Amino acid sequence: MLRSIGVPAADIARSWANVAVPGRMEDVSAGYPVRVLVDYAHTPDAVERALTAARGQGRLIAVIGAGGDRDRGKRPEMGALAARLADGVWITDDNPRSEDPAAIRAAVREGVMTVPGDLRAEVRETGDRARAIHEAISAAHPGDVVAILGKGHESGQDVAGVVTEFDDR
C-alpha cells in the first residue's frame, strides 16, 4: 500500500527497523552492563526461536518457567531446550495458577536433566521470579545476554487465583 502511494521501499524498510512489539524480544537493557531481553515465549517452539535469536558473542542466560493449568507436556521440552541452547538457566515460576509451583518447576527441570551433562547449561531454581531475574542479571558479565522468557508484556503473576502486579521489565 505504501509503495502504491509512492513511498520508496528503502524508507519502508527503515521504518520497520524501528517497530517494536512490547514483550517480544523487547530490549530492557537500559541501566544494565549486559543485554536483557524480555519475550513472551511460552511454548517449546517459541523458546527455541527466542533463545536462538538472543544468542550473541558472550554467554546466554535464560530465565524460564511454565504456566500452570496449561499443557503439562510442554514443560520438560521447554526445560531441555533452555538447557541445550543457553549457558545458564534459572527455572522459576510463571503464572502457576491453581497448580503447585514446585511441581511445575520440577517438570521443567526434568527436561533439563535429559540433556547430557557436557551439553547442559548450569541450572538454578527459585520460585521467586523477581529473585531469579535479579540473580540471572547479576551473574551475567558485559557481553552476555539475559533472556527472560514466558511473561513478555504481562503485568501480573497468577498464583492460586490471586493475581499480583508483576512485570518482567
Question: What positions do the PLM features span?
Answer:
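ATP-dependent carboxylate-amine ligase
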Residues: 1-169
